[in-house]
């Protein structure tokens, strides 16, 4: 007989984190379900392996349908948040849709669930490839994960992991952009992804094309589980479980086997990547919680100099392609405090990208005289961000700010073989202090027929006089939604957005050692 599993979870008030007692929780499009107990917890037993959604509802709250998730070889714990409703009591119908409408983003938000990640044709369980299939996202080379949304470039996207900003989500990433051939984030960690292609929340700054907000699962509260996975390009495991009564964890490690496949089919380069990810969540009490998470990758691309097929094409590739070594990580912590209907959040994180390219003439490493390229670069970011939500009748105020310090270094040794051989010794060091403020006011009418969101964001840094005034990078935004009748809405949004150029541009020096783009009065 097929083994059955349980879906467990808790239903909480989105405003204050308090459990919602006696809420209805059912499996979407079925009559199978239950009611939460006095502390908001629920359990649905006898669930066969497969993909499901949950529907939760209670008097005085907006009905909610979760993103799709999978039951395979373990019980699932699923937290659900309900938002208070100001609408008069009446019969309601719940419609599941991948498009989630919010006051801040009534048009540009799409929620990506597990099934879409798993089943997307050619997606290979990689979120970037899933997004590439969406309208408004340009197609790129089959071996690249670059996101070009609404005509923008791959450097114009921002990524957040449970509120912690991460600089890139791909192995062998392009420095100064976000592309790469393979994703770093383990899809088994993901609960859902909010993909904003327009009308970004004011709390998510420094983006021109899109924002991807990843929401991760929590570890199992009751028992330990271990899962092994063999993917199209890697092998790995994921472990999760409790670490005491108030703490859960999950951790995964993956390593590629592409280097063996590439060697077998006779390709001139052998890429190897390893990534690790973890999340630890501790609930002090109903009012306070702390999540600590990390994401890291080690990438190494060697040259297959011992291959048998030394065709002219392969010789050409081996002659110009460098050895690539890249390391990247992000460590972050998110603390949340619930006070009445208000939520206070503090996020701290540190990220680093270490990038090395090395090339020897004829790939002969026996002598340093053969060294033609030695590129070494580091990007380090330290971030502190505060986000606060204050709720009033028919009105919500989101305010916060951020403070960041980043460093960028580049050491390049290169021999150029032209008419007269010459050596380039280039180095640059850049330190950058960044700060920003934001505020958003959200109004909902009594019957929720009309919603309005007015937000403003301002960012600045100490790079140059053109960038150090918050008012010069003032970013207002307005979103409106009006229900004409039934489920027919009239929606609209408008905004002005800014993005800081990449560190490779800001830190570029001329032959005299001056920051060239600072002298050119570069702005956001």
Question: Where do the protein language model's features map onto the residues?
Answer:
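Periplasm-facing N-terminal accessory domains of Gram-negative outer-membrane beta-barrel systems
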Residues: 1-91, 95
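Periplasmic N-terminal accessory/gating domains of Gram-negative outer-membrane beta-barrel systems
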Residues: 62, 68-70, 78, 95, ...
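Flexible, surface-exposed loop regions and adjacent strand-edge segments
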Residues: 111-113, 178, 267-272, 306-317, ...
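Hydrophobic, lipid-facing positions within transmembrane beta-strands of outer-membrane proteins
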Residues: 145, 208-210, 224, 230-237, ...
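Outer-envelope beta-barrel architecture signal
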Residues: 155-157, 189, 222-226, 245-249, ...
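Predominantly transmembrane beta-strands of Gram-negative outer membrane beta-barrel pores used
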Residues: 158, 192-203, 209-217, 224-268, ...
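Face-selective signature of the C-terminal outer-membrane beta-barrel domain
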Residues: 281-299, 321-467
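Outer-membrane beta-barrel signature, preferentially recognizing the C-terminal barrel domain
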Residues: 311-335, 377, 428-430, 489, ...
